Design a protein with these regions (language model features):
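Local sequence-structure signature of Cys/Sec-based thiol-disulfide redox active-site neighborhoods
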Residues: 51-91
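Solvent-exposed loop/turn segments at secondary-structure junctions
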Residues: 69-73, 98-102, 132-134, 142
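Short Fe-S-cluster ligation motifs
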Residues: 101-121
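Extracytoplasmic/periplasmic, Sec-exported soluble proteins
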Residues: 44, 69, 73-76, 117, ...
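Non-catalytic, surface beta->alpha helical segment in thiol-disulfide oxidoreductase systems
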Residues: 119-158
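Thiol-based oxidoreductase modules, predominantly thioredoxin-like and allied folds used
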Residues: 43-46, 90-108
Length: 158
């Protein structure tokens, strides 16, 4: 075999491994009946870590953005998320990591399947059904991408 054949085989194997590893952060979508009604008040609202734990424990369908005030990308992203939440009349929550204790941050980082298995930063958006991760957005995306994230997955208000 030629050197290029070995390189090609190596690249294909790496892509397969990356695909397998990256798919472990979310639950199989075919198991979930869409659209889901998100719990909570319409718009973008900060929740405490205790409120987050309660939503997980109750098996609620909810979207939580993990952000921090001092994050430049969060400062750009959060107004877009708020705009989409208000326009589509859906409930979106967020946890500001600057407002939780170190112990709560540690619990959040180690008990949430996505955060435990993946490197993450802020903003991170998680669509959750109890403790199951339905989908996620890692980092800043534009408004159209946020709208696409919700499309056909959530009940839009009227």
């Amino acid at each position: 075999m030629k050197k290029t054949d070995f390189i090609l085989i190596g690249v294909v194997l790496v892509l397969i491994i990356v695909g397998i590893v990256s798919s472990k952060g979310t639950e199989a979508l075919e198991e979930i009946e869409f659209p889901l009604t998100l719990s909570g008040e319409v718009g973008l609202h900060e929740i405490t870590y205790s409120e987050y734990e309660e939503k997980v424990k109750n098996g609620d369908a909810f979207v939580v953005v993990i952000e921090r005030t001092t994050c430049g990308y969060c400062q750009q992203y959060m107004p877009l998320m708020e705009e989409v939440a208000n326009e589509q009349k859906i409930a979106v929550t967020y946890i500001n990591t600057d407002n939780i204790t170190e112990e709560e941050f540690e619990k959040l980082s180690t008990t949430n399947k996505y955060l435990k298995k993946n490197q993450w930063g802020t903003p991170t958006t998680l669509f959750m059904l109890g403790d199951r991760i339905v989908d996620s957005i890692g980092g800043y995306v534009d408004k159209e991408s946020i709208e696409a994230f919700f499309k056909d997955r959530v009940v839009v208000g009227e």
